[in-house]
Amino acid sequence: MIVNLITTVYNFLWGDLFTIPLPGGSSLGISLLILLLIPTGIYFTIRTRFLPIRLFPDMIRALSEKKNEKSSLSSFQTLIVSTATRVGMGNLVGVVAAVSAGGAGAVFWMWVTAIIGSSTAFIEATLAQLHKEEDPLYGGYRGGPAYYIHDLVEDHLKKKKRYVLPAVLFAIAGLICWCGISQVISNSVASSFKNAFSIPPLYTSIMLVILSAIIVLRKNATVKVLDFIVPVMAVCYFFITLFIIAVNLRQIPSVFARIFEEAFGLRQMAAGGFGAVLMNGVKRGLFSNEAGSGSAPCAAAAAECDRPTKAGLVQALGVFVDTIVICSCTAMIMLLAPKDLIDGLSGMDLLQTAMQYHLGKFGVIFIALTLFLFSFSTFLGILFYARSNVAYLFGDKWCFQTAYKVLALVMLFIGGIAAYTFVWDLGDVGIGLMTIFNIIALYPLAGEALSELKSYEESKKS
């Protein structure tokens, strides 16, 4: 029954809301999430006057923002936390899923989602800074969509309330999403460790749960661990990919030609596959870079900044790093492998086969260990996100914080032996519901973030 419910909600969010006829008798299905994300990204890109391109140097400079309070986080640390979840499983498993289902053209639509999504990420992160509050449990600050949605409804009603329904629904959707992601984490790691080391999924799941519990059940260990893991894993993965690209340099032009040809190709339209290309690219782009979903603002709110705009710029940069850089690395690893070698494969089997082609047995081991680190950091990152949502729903009580962590650890264990499609659908349902509630709030609140952006740019001139 639960599986049927999840499938029904998944189809409502990601299934075809309506179709657009295409040449050759085929059609393009447009889902509710596509209808929300693409126009929203374009709208905010125009309203911010193409911020991702125009203010890219400012994004880099914002990383140097210093903090004054010991218990708070710097802009760079909040980027590390959000990058832990962005540069995580979505960059490996997500890209594999997108290319498996939608072909090479899905990579292009992931890029598009990232470019226009950077502006959305800026708006939501800036709003999180504007509506943050002090965190009496962990120290520093907390916030996110549940908090700015709450303030929006309170302003509309012109009265103080303990809870408002849209904020409650967002917080619940977030907790569902992160439980779903917890399952995907162990599912993917267990699969890769079985292929690389012949370790049964049960043992891998137990190991992952124990290591995670050691970190997450301690008060403020999460950020300290992520500060070390995230830069190391991202740099190692990037340079291994550069090596593979250098070895296969002559094939690069044909790979890019394939990406663009399949993104717009008449062959895909005629076969009715263009919708799958677009849908899988955008869906996996969202799952990877989180722009518009409301996840990253939970980290952005924790930053100590002299201007809220700087937190927004940092999170916009995070979207770029995640999708344009790291996701492209995974795509190149797959697309530089012979097509007949990986045809019929999916998930981690596909990626490990591609890595084995490039680097031999070392490639299989490397991708298994990389996935483990990416997934481990993702789990730590999503539990950081969950703090503010648990606090919004249940108040400043440690028992509820601990209870959700234990629930997530249980889901982490279950995911190692669960069906692949089911766990992806649960994560997609959660992130889809979050996106709906978040985007509905962004439009009436965007003026606050745009006003901050205008003030920031005027201060640069003076």
Where are these regions (language model features)?
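Extracellular/periplasmic helix-exit of transmembrane alpha-helices
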Residues: 124-136, 242-258, 272, 302-305, ...
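Helix-loop-helix module between adjacent transmembrane segments
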Residues: 40-45, 113-141, 150-187, 191-215, ...
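N-terminal alpha-helical transmembrane segments of multi-pass membrane transport
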Residues: 1-89, 99-106, 117, 413, ...
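Alpha-helical membrane segments and immediately flanking helix-loop junctions
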Residues: 69-101, 127-130, 137-153, 169-172, ...
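Transmembrane helix-loop junctions in multi-pass membrane proteins
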Residues: 47-52, 91-95, 177-190, 212-225, ...
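Membrane-interface loop-to-helix entry segments
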Residues: 36, 44-60, 166, 187-193, ...
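Selective recognition of specific alpha-helical transmembrane segments in multi-pass small-molecule
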Residues: 116-124, 204-219, 230-250, 283-286, ...
